[in-house]
């Protein structure tokens, strides 16, 4: 999927979950965007590219290309 939404660091309790590398498992951020996840079985997609949106203010989502699982 091209142009999925990556959550902003300002929207997450752990801003690092908005800093992803290619191959990072991504889960739902419960608002329609994605965030990095390490929880077993929670991934819905895998990042196809590196995107760092950890410093973004709340609501400033970034576009990211992903492979849906």
Please describe what each predicted stretch is:
Residues 1-69:
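Surface-exposed, low-hydrophobicity beta-strand/loop segments enriched in small/polar/acidic residues
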């Amino acid at each position: 999927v091209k142009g999925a939404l990556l959550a902003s660091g300002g929207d997450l309790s752990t801003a690092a979950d908005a800093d992803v590398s290619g191959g990072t498992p991504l889960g739902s951020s419960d608002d329609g965007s994605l965030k990095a996840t390490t929880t077993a079985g929670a991934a819905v997609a895998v990042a196809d590219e590196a995107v760092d949106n950890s410093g973004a203010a709340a609501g400033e989502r970034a576009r990211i290309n992903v492979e849906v699982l």
